[in-house]
Curated annotation (Swiss-Prot):
It comes from Vibrio atlanticus (strain LGP32) (Vibrio splendidus (strain Mel32)). PANTHER family: PHOSPHOENOLPYRUVATE CARBOXYKINASE (ATP), PHOSPHOENOLPYRUVATE CARBOXYKINASE ATP. Involved in the gluconeogenesis. Catalyzes the conversion of oxaloacetate (OAA) to phosphoenolpyruvate (PEP) through direct phosphoryl transfer between the nucleoside triphosphate and OAA. This is Phosphoenolpyruvate carboxykinase (ATP). The keyword Protein transport does not apply. Its EC number is 4.1.1.49. Pathway: Carbohydrate biosynthesis; gluconeogenesis.
Length: 541
């Protein structure tokens, strides 16, 4: 076996990972090497990379254009039995498997990767050396190696020389599981984790995000048990060193609002909060590109150049990209190293404690105020609720709101009971003297969405502290404290009741939404912490 490396780091032994007969190992190859490897003329199918006019390579991930939550499994053993938030305890994707089934799945992956020419990427998940995971990703596909080189934190040559993995990811995308029915699994595809062995294995799916989000789920297990908040949020820092974090589900404005020319980006998706402050888990960004334009999102557009990797976009014959084409998927993506963004914090990916915590929601019911200041109990309640809503059009042009509740604004990646994340977050906030705000970027009684100008004015008022000087009143039913006036924000929208010609209309919609909140929160009342928070939510007399 030969080991090609861009450093003189010690050779690595893959037999300890169950891989034998490996013909060649390309360990942490340069971007230049990866570009050559992923665009080789002989490559076919999903291995083939296409060079676009922007200089970045584009790949197709086949039918898997997003994560496969129904194919996610975790070994239930002495390590996880009493700590994991299992699928039978709540509506989640943490489905248990036995060590016997794990051994069979792992055998499929090690057989697939043995005897092959392999790419090995060693990187870090977490910018804090004290708590980061040293992750080794093993794959036979060049662009998958490129993806994780972009997304994980890249070690220095000195760090590589002594690198020992805490966690190993083996991606056997080309193999599937023929015995899935007999094993009681969902399909022939699998994304499985063993916390005792500290290994993730992948079979059947080519989607790059499984590797990134897999390690996020593991950080979500390991960090809160040490009292460190693990968060699905974006983060930025102002000129005075003031840090803000933005939680929000897809479509609420998390990326748009945290990308601010007046503030430096810490990261766009996954962060921790420890005794030193906020830190990014990642070394790159994974941005949606559907309907991307240079005018609307110049930072992301300009990041798409050599070393960026596009997924599932339509590339025309001349190499130009049709970002408006969602025929493969609406979830078209690009990964790129974080240094492709100009306005990033230095040193990269770390800053002090957060002073402002912003929960973004897009309320399509037209009930919630555009901004509310939350008490610590309300902070936990709304963090656990993780509410947003979308408008789905019907054939007669009527629009019906569809609510989504996702605990901690990232339920798909939680591995402990949601109340544990809320407790750790609020403890960190209280120690730092941080304030929390609920910001609604959705609709009101006018039937229109709250303007981006008003929302930006609200965010500015939160960040500069002027919102805390404003006079306030309390909105009934939800008991939310709202300002009467804010600089650069239309005062007529601050109380949502004022946006309706008939205030009774707001009341009937508010009752409907309050009931949905109450019914959703019922699942968290299986422990004392959850029960104690019911009073912080909406109240119906």
């Amino acid at each position: 076996m030969t080991v090609m490396e861009h450093t003189k780091a010690a050779q690595i032994d893959l037999t300890k990972h169950g891989l034998t007969g490996v013909t060649e190992v390309l360990r942490n190859p340069s971007y230049e090497q990866l570009f050559v490897e992923e665009t080789l003329p002989g490559l076919e199918g999903y291995e083939k990379g296409v060079v676009t006019e922007l200089g970045s390579v584009a790949v197709d991930t086949g039918i898997f254009t997003g994560r496969s939550p129904k194919d996610k499994y975790i070994v239930k053993d002495d390590t996880t039995r009493d700590t994991m938030w299992w699928s039978d305890q709540g509506k989640n994707d943490n489905k248990p498997i036995t060590t016997e089934v794990w051994d069979e799945l792992k055998e499929l992956v090690t057989t697939q990767l043995s005897g092959k020419r392999l790419f090995v990427i060693d990187g870090y998940c977490g910018a804090n050396p004290d708590t980061r995971l040293s992750v080794r990703i093993i794959t036979e596909v060049a662009w998958q190696a490129h993806f994780v080189k972009n997304m994980f934190i890249r070690p220095t040559d000195e760090e590589l020389a002594t690198f020992e993995p805490d966690f190993v990811v083996m991606n056997g995308a080309k193999t599937t599981n023929p015995n899935w029915e007999k094993q009681g699994l969902n399909s022939e595809n699998f994304v499985a984790f063993n916390l005792t062995e500290r290994v993730q294995i992948i079979g059947g799916t080519w989607y790059g995000g499984e590797m990134k989000k897999g390690m996020f789920a593991m950080m979500n297990y390991l960090l809160p048990l040490q009292g460190i908040a693990s968060m699905h949020c974006s983060a930025n820092v102002g000129e005075e060193g003031d840090v803000a974090i933005f939680f929000g589900l897809s479509g609420t404005g998390k990326t748009t609002l945290s990308t601010d020319p007046k503030r430096e980006l810490i990261g766009d998706d996954e962060h921790g909060w420890d005794d030193d402050g906020i830190f990014n888990f990642e070394g790159g960004c994974y941005a949606k590109t559907i309907r991307l334009s240079k005018e609307a999102e110049p930072e992301i557009y300009n990041a798409i150049r050599r070393d960026a990797l596009l997924e599932n976009v339509t590339v025309r014959g001349d190499g130009s990209i049709d970002f408006d084409d969602g025929s493969k998927t609406e979830n078209t993506r690009v990964s790129y190293p974080i240094h492709h963004i100009d306005n990033i914090v230095k040193p990269v990916s770390k800053a002090g404690h957060a002073q402002k915590v912003i929960f973004l929601t897009a309320d399509a019911f037209g009930v919630l105020p555009p901004v509310s200041k939350l008490t610590p109990e309300q902070t936990k309640y709304h963090f656990l609720s993780g509410f947003t809503a979308k408008l789905a059009g019907t054939e007669r042009g009527i629009t019906e709101p569809t609510p989504t509740f996702s605990a901690a604004f990232g339920a798909a990646f939680l591995t402990l009971h949601p109340t544990q994340y809320a407790e750790v977050l609020v403890k960190r906030m209280e120690a730092a003297g941080a304030e929390a705000y609920l910001v609604n970027t959705g609709w009101n009684g006018t039937g229109k969405r709250i303007s981006i100008q008003d929302t930006r004015g609200i965010i500015d008022a939160i960040l500069d502290g002027s919102i805390d000087q404003a006079e306030t009143k309390v909105i009934p039913m939800f008991n939310l404290e709202v300002p009467l006036a804010l600089h650069d924000v239309d005062p007529a929208i601050l109380d949502p009741r004022d946006t309706y010609t008939d205030p009774l209309q707001w009341e009937s919609k508010a009752k409907d939404l309050a009931e949905r909140f109450i019914n959703n929160f019922d699942k968290y009342t299986d422990n004392a912490e959850g029960k104690s928070l019911v009073a912080a939510g909406p109240q119906l007399d």
